[in-house]
């Protein structure tokens, strides 16, 4: 490991003299790129509801504009991605044929946002324009190049790094080209956004900020309310520290224009080596500076992505400083296990170093364990931090998305999953391999969806839902969870036809704080509707609803409790692995009014809902079955490759803070 770290440090040092000058911050000033039709007041949607509807979408989508997708031979552009999201077919590569496989979504989404990696927008554009006369650096974008180490190094280096021979000494050539690519992306989103009263589809202008600083994943998807946006996206090559990105987004967008609004959604904390939710504040030494940074983070990042194709980031068993027993459902989609083996040679890794200058310790990717890599414990860590400085920097709502690199926005169906990375996993044999030698190996999955409770399917209504954190994530199915908390919720709400309106009137929805102080224990309305699915792919019934409670004890340890409040965890539901046929009964709808029997009015606490389906076949089991028995890789029989999953939905939390 020491040798690997030395190689990283040497490589960064050698690259240190290859960077260009940083651009003036004026290049990020907000500009109005709205199409003319979007500047007019729009009609109310036909399906408008004061009680709010559940809308499903994908806000983590890569197309051929992303350097890694292009290098794996994906040629689905943003137009194609939006087309796929809303029902059109697209074509994916297989070997030398870049349009060999035709795929179509099983059900159109309500909304989508293409989030191509903003890093190298300009470099890739110039390389394509210059063709054979392009500098040697451009080989990193070549067909079949995959994830080129030269590019990875540039998003790992803790300093600004662009190729001078392509971008010019001042970087202006790449900057101008990046603006061209960005404006084109904005125009595409504008073109697909439905502004009629039908409200059939909503698109968001978006991009990804892809920090892999010092070898830890610190990526964020940046989502704008409309097409009044910075003139150029703020990428890792422009803002090496995430708090610099937050500052620029606030100064240039939120404060810089009456019409610009933005939020960012971090993802893949599971492979961040504990850095995503670390409560150190490099450069902010006083409590006042730390408070300011925590407030800025919550303004820019009100939501976290808990699930995508690189696994689940909810929780993990066996972590230091986490008490409360084993949660078997935390073993779900642990992408990082294979990553640990690939990087360190073993799935068993040490705890992450968390001492001084821990954010300067280089990694080669996910290579250590830390509770600060997982959402559940970040929620509890936020309670502790609020007690210390008066601000909770981790008071976020919960979402999910796909992170497809095929342009397949919302392509989450397990039954016919075509992969996520072009020629990196173009065949069934690739997708069921459990090895780091295959880019799209079976530790990956289709990913999830974000659900938003909103009055209508418009940018403003959906964005407002994200701002107030009335959002939820699913591992793919369109489960509809509702979660309310209050001091006087009626106990018969589940049987009341006016359940939702009364819950809003007498409580708060997911994403909010329990109001005021009460000597009584809080009551929660916990409800979910199963995904009915489609005629071709029927949905699975629900098995159970669980409330997860988090708090910290007097020793500073994280405490957790998982309570099944509806359904039956022992209902006997299973799957015939010879055919993937589900067996056993479940529930189309579950509901309960639950009161916390262990409530302590002096103790900060956080609650969220997890709705769990009956077991079903994972995509890897389906694809092993579809291969002739004599052609199945040995991995099809490996215990390391999961055959069954329990799909699920997670609500945003509800918080309690003592007065």
For each feature predicted by the language model, list its residue ranges:
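Low-complexity, serine/threonine/proline-enriched polar segments
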Residues: 140-167
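The substrate-binding groove and active-site-proximal loops of carbohydrate-active enzymes
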Residues: 67-72, 165-179, 228-240, 364-373
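C-terminal motif of bacterial Sec signal peptides marking the signal peptidase cleavage site
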Residues: 15-17
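Cap/lid and interdomain-hinge subdomains that line or gate substrate/regulatory clefts
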Residues: 173-181, 197, 237-265
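Long, charge-dense tracts
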Residues: 223-225
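Sec-dependent signal peptide recognition
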Residues: 2-9
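C-terminal functional module detector
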Residues: 19-78, 82, 89-141, 174, ...
């Amino acid at each position: 490991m020491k040798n690997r770290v030395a190689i990283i440090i040497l490589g960064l040092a050698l690259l240190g003299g290859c960077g260009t000058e940083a651009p003036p911050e004026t290049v990020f000033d907000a500009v109005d790129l709205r199409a003319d039709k979007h500047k007019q007041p729009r009609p109310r949607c036909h399906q408008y509801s004061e009680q709010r509807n559940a809308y499903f979408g994908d806000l983590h989508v890569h197309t051929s504009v992303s350097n890694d997708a292009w290098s794996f031979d994906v040629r689905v552009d943003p137009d194609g991605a939006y087309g796929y999201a809303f029902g059109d077919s697209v074509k994916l590569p297989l070997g030398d044929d870049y349009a060999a496989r035709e795929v179509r979504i099983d059900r159109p989404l309500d909304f989508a946002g293409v989030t191509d990696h903003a890093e190298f927008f300009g470099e890739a554009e110039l390389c394509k324009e210059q063709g054979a006369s392009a500098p040697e650096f451009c080989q990193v974008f070549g067909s079949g190049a995959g994830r080129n180490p030269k590019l990875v190094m540039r998003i790992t280096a803790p300093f600004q790094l662009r190729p001078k021979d392509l971008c010019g000494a001042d970087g202006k050539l790449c900057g101008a080209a990046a603006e061209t690519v960005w404006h084109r992306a904005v125009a595409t989103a504008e073109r697909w956004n439905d502004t009629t009263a039908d409200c059939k589809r909503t698109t968001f202008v978006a991009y990804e900020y892809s920090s892999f600083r010092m070898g830890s994943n610190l990526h964020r998807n940046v989502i704008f309310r409309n097409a009044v946006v910075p003139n150029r996206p703020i990428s890792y090559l422009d803002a090496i520290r995430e708090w610099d990105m937050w500052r620029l987004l606030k100064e240039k967008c939120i404060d810089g224009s009456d019409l610009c609004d933005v939020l960012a959604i971090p993802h893949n904390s599971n492979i961040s080596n504990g850095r995503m939710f670390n409560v150190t504040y490099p450069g902010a030494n006083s409590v006042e500076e730390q408070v300011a940074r925590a407030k800025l983070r919550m303004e820019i990042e009100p939501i976290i992505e808990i699930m995508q194709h690189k696994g689940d980031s909810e929780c993990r068993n066996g972590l230091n400083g986490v008490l409360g027993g084993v949660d078997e459902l935390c073993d779900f989609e642990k992408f990082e296990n294979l990553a640990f083996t690939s990087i360190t040679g073993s799935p068993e890794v040490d705890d992450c170093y968390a001492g001084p200058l821990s954010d300067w310790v280089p990694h080669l990717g996910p290579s250590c364990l830390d509770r600060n890599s997982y959402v559940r414990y970040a929620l509890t860590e936020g309670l502790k931090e609020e007690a210390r400085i008066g601000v909770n920097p981790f008071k976020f709502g919960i979402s999910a998305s796909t992170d497809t690199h095929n342009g397949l926005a919302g392509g989450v169906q397990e039954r016919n999953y075509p992969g996520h990375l072009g020629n990196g996993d173009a065949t069934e044999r690739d997708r069921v391999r459990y090895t780091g030698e295959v880019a799209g190996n079976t530790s990956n999955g289709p990913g999830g969806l974000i659900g938003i409770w909103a009055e209508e399917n418009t940018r403003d209504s959906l964005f407002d839902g994200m701002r107030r954190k009335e959002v939820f994530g699913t591992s793919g199915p369109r489960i509809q969870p509702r979660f309310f908390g209050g001091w006087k919720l009626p106990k018969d709400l589940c049987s009341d036809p006016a359940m939702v309106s009364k819950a809003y009137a007498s409580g708060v929805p997911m994403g909010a704080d329990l109001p005021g102080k009460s000597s009584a224990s809080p009551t929660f309305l916990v409800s979910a509707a199963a995904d009915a699915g489609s005629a071709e792919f029927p949905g699975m019934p629900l098995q159970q609803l669980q409330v997860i409670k988090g708090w910290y004890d007097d020793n500073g340890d994280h405490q957790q409790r998982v309570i099944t409040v509806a359904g039956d965890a022992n209902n006997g539901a299973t799957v015939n692995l010879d055919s993937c046929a589900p067996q056993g009964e479940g529930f189309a709808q579950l509901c309960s009014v639950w009161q916390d029997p262990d409530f302590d009015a002096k103790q900060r606490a956080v609650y969220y809902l997890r709705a769990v389906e009956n077991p079903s076949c994972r995509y890897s089991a389906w694809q092993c079955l579809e291969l002739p028995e004599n052609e199945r890789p040995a991995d099809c029989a490996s215990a390391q490759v999961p055959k069954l999953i329990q799909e699920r939905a997670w609500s945003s939390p509800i918080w309690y803070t003592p007065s």
